[in-house]
Curated annotation (Swiss-Prot):
Keyword Transferase recorded: yes
EC number assigned by the record: 2.4.1.159
Disulfide cross-links: none
Catalyzed reactions: a flavonol 3-O-beta-D-glucoside + UDP-beta-L-rhamnose = a flavonol 3-O-[alpha-L-rhamnosyl-(1->6)-beta-D-glucoside] + UDP + H(+)
Task of the protein: Flavonol 3-O-glucoside (1->6) rhamnosyltransferase converting kaempferol 3-O-glucoside to kaempferol 3-O-rutinoside and utilizing 3-O-glucosylated/galactosylated flavonols and UDP-rhamnose as substrates. Prefers kaempferol to quercetin as an aglycon, and 3-O-galactosides to 3-O-glucosides as a glycosylation pattern.
Name of the protein: UDP-glycosyltransferase 79A6
Annotated residues for binding of an anthocyanidin: H24, G380
Note in the entry: Flavonol glycosides (FGs) having rhamnose at the 6''-position of glucose or galactose that is bound to the 3-position of kaempferol are present in cv. Koganejiro, whereas FGs of cv. Kitakomachi are devoid of rhamnose.
Keyword Glycosyltransferase (UniProt): yes
GO molecular function: flavonol-3-O-glucoside L-rhamnosyltransferase activity; UDP-glucosyltransferase activity
PROSITE patterns named in the record: UDPGT
Amino acid sequence: MPSELAMNNDELHVVMFPFLAFGHISPFVQLSNKLFSHGVHVTFLSAASNIPRIRSTLNLNPAINVISLKFPNGITNTAELPPHLAGNLIHALDLTQDQVKSLLLELKPHYVFFDFAQHWLPKLASEVGIKSVHFSVYSAISDAYITVPSRFADVEGRNITFEDLKKPPPGYPQNSNISLKAFEAMDFMFLFTRFGEKNLTGYERVLQSLGECSFIVFKTCKEIEGPYLDYIETQFRKPVLLSGPLVPEPSTDVLEEKWSKWLDGFPAKSVILCSFGSETFLSDYQIKELASGLELTGLPFILVLNFPSNLSAKAELERALPKGYLERVKNRGVVHSGWFQQQLVLKHSSVGCYVCHGGFSSVIEAMVNECQLVLLPFKGDQFFNSKLIANDLKAGVEVNRSDEDGFFHKEDILEALKTVMLEDNKEQGKQIRENHMQWSKFLSNKEIQNKFITDLVAQLKSMA
């Protein structure tokens, strides 16, 4: 049931309504916690099956009300769907419009924060006198490159191609040398495919969301993505507000003894952690090359690999890993599948490098913990986040890949790791480490991070 908490006249009330993938839910939860700590009343909307996990990450605070939406087909998150059926989830979201409208009428919040898929929400919110805020879970560099009106400026009515996407849109920040490889551009072509009863593309949904909302909020800051934020503001001609990078609060959990004992056996900053999250599944060739590259370094490592829930992780690992691999690395390497205390492992003094997919939250987490970054992106905004860190900020290194198919070899993994772990006295490695340290200090400064939220709350109050 909706919240019955009494509202003070000067208390800001926001409703959070993310897309149903946990990669989207998590930033909304992080922002909810930050806003609540600054006196903002928060109500969270999601599917029933997601609520236990959401509650567990909302600082265990019962004052943040979580409301269950009903979904007619029972599909409630991307973990339950293969990628080619993700459109079904968006369609299911479209069918919640009447529920959402009734809740907004009852709750009467000042704002509703929403995600890319709910292109219909700005109009719906306006009809009931509520302002809508598009909260982008993606980096500004990504949105500025892909989902801006000028993306179609040179297309002239024809269908967009991956060759178009290899180049930045007209007006893209001139000081940026960002472009996409062929395999990266191909990954974004799904955004221009029509699906669902409304026959809209993902690009059209995002553009409508950004174009019709009251204003836009990004989980970044000018220091990191200034030129891209300015470009987006120019493209959509509306305020772009910032929450800051939403640096996660330190975990109150304790690292499991099996991990702490293993890590304690190695020197400071010598261990490589390699992990790609719960919804990224590597192919056999990718596993073989990645595992072999880690082996070639001669350094201790933890390799976390996950697989679809309908497969046996043990069987998949036995098939995909190089023959005799576990025996060869048994004294310095661990291959793990399943739940993993990533934040606590990154914090351990023995961990010195994080090989990840370039998800923005993962990158921030690594930089706060002073772990060197090796970036191996697989989809979407991960490609841009990796380029931002490696090219713009020069605070990490991206694994070299072939242009056409994204293929990488064990030697590419080795070279990237050598740059930040074994050749830190050479110019490139030295520069990366120095830049990384500066960004780590910036992100770890609680006064700076607190000011981002203080300023955002002040702006929200002034615009309510």
